[in-house]
Amino acid sequence: MRANKKLNIVLDIGKTNIKLIFFDQNNKVVKSFNSKQRSTKKHGIKVLNSPSVYEWTLQKIKTVEKKYQLNKFVCTAHACSTALIDFNDKELIACTDYEFPYHKYVKGYQKIIPSFNESYTPLLENGLNTGLQLYYLNQKKPELIKKTKYFLNYPQYITWKMTNNYTSEISYLGCHTHLWDFKKNKLSSLVKKLKFQNKFPSNEKAWKTIGVKKIGHSKLQIINGVHDSNASYLYFKNSNIKNFTLVSSGTWYIIFNQKNSLKKLK
């Protein structure tokens, strides 16, 4: 017999650990599951086991749905992991692993990145700039880029798997990527230089319902998704707490401070 409770679901993908959490309408945890994220080699680079993460998630959701009604689903994920989807709606890469040393294999990236005051993104090593990952693929794997219809951020990759709808989202797209112009609120000059303007789906709000997935007797609303630490920051920003500093911990420590002025950043 199924309980009357309607559950909301959060898939929280960290670089090391994955959590799938089921909440009731009072935000009390009813069920939770844990897994690990792993990587392998494909097309000569490190890629994450994102398709397996999706299948694991779907299997757990189906199991819980036998006892509970389901309401909404949202995915949060760590930054700098991108899926490449071809024109037949198949994965070419899902998803890139930022621990691959992209910076060792290509030159010239530093010459074409936007100014700091455009993207507010420092130049980082390995794949910690999504723009560097895409620059590498454009230089070393042009055949993959030609086959690519869309680049999907990790949360929106999961959303696409759930709904078959393509979207982007600003908290992820702008998170140390070199891909977003914060002053003009649009894709950056780097995207234009690489001629990738049409390879990013339209931006939607993180909290927008993108589609509905039928699972058992439930019609599960699929929310667009968001970068994990930004989701934590938004929660406290919308609370009554003022002038706070947030430390988001896990594989990385990310620090947010409301008082910092963008003019002071270099």
Stretch-by-stretch model annotation:
Residues M1-A3, V212-H217, F236-I241:
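A short acidic-Thr-Gly-centered motif at the start of a beta-strand
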Residues M1-A94, K147, H217-N224:
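N-terminal glycine/serine-rich phosphate-binding loop of ATP-dependent small-molecule kinases
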Residues I13-K15, N117-K219, I223-S229:
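Gly/Ser/Thr-rich active-site cleft segment
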Residues Y54-K62, G131-L134, H227-L234:
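Short, hydrophobic/amphipathic alpha-helical packing segments
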Residues K67-T130:
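Active-site phosphate-binding/coordination module
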Residues F73-S81, A206-K208, S249-W252:
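Glycine-rich beta-strand-to-loop/alpha-helix junction loops that act as flexible
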Residues T82-Y109, T148, L152-L187, L220-K266:
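Glycine-rich phosphate-binding loop of actin/hexokinase-like ATP-binding domains
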